[in-house]
Amino acid sequence: GYDQKGNLIRQLEKVTQKQVEFYMRDTPQYPHTSTIISELLKRAIKNEKDDIEKIIKLTNFVSEYVEDDYESNSISVFDVIETKKGDCTEHAQLFTVLARAAGFPTREVGGWAYDGKNRFIPHAWTEVAIKLDDDYYWVPADPTWDMIIPVVHIKSNAESILGKFSLILKEINFANGEKIQY
């Protein structure tokens, strides 16, 4: 039979222990131990116990909390929290901070996303380390578009073979006339 979970795991990148430690750090860019962050986290996930459901709730919360604003000039995640505005980078930053506060190693990634208008555009989203069976795997989450494991994204700036793929995208002739937008 078809093993959906096994098939999913084979497609995800395994997380190393070093990465778990690195992507749980509290830093000026990702100050996840702040009281303000803790309060926002409680609003986002409430009393949820299931890890996957927590990620779904966080993705949905950030998508609804942050209004799309491509002119946003947020300096920190606290600016994003205060203004409730931002582009994909602000969505990803707030999600990263909240997910780390919830105990999930999380990283921002960037690359290309299909926008449904026959083009790929520069985009930022996140990857969350989730335990599946006995190991941790990077699971993509896009809080801008409220998507878990988006199939329309091509990562280019994290530790992945797909990063090399973005370099040749401009050479591909898409069947429906899709374009790469820089």
Regions found by a protein language model. Give the residues of each.
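Extended acidic/polar, glycine-enriched regions
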Residues: G1-L12
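Acidic-enriched, low-complexity/disordered segments with a strong bias for Aspartate over Glutamate
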Residues: D3, D26, D50-D51, D68-D69, ...
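Secondary-structure boundary elements
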Residues: V15-G86, S160-Y182
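Hydrophobic/aromatic-rich core segments of domains that either
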Residues: H91-Q181
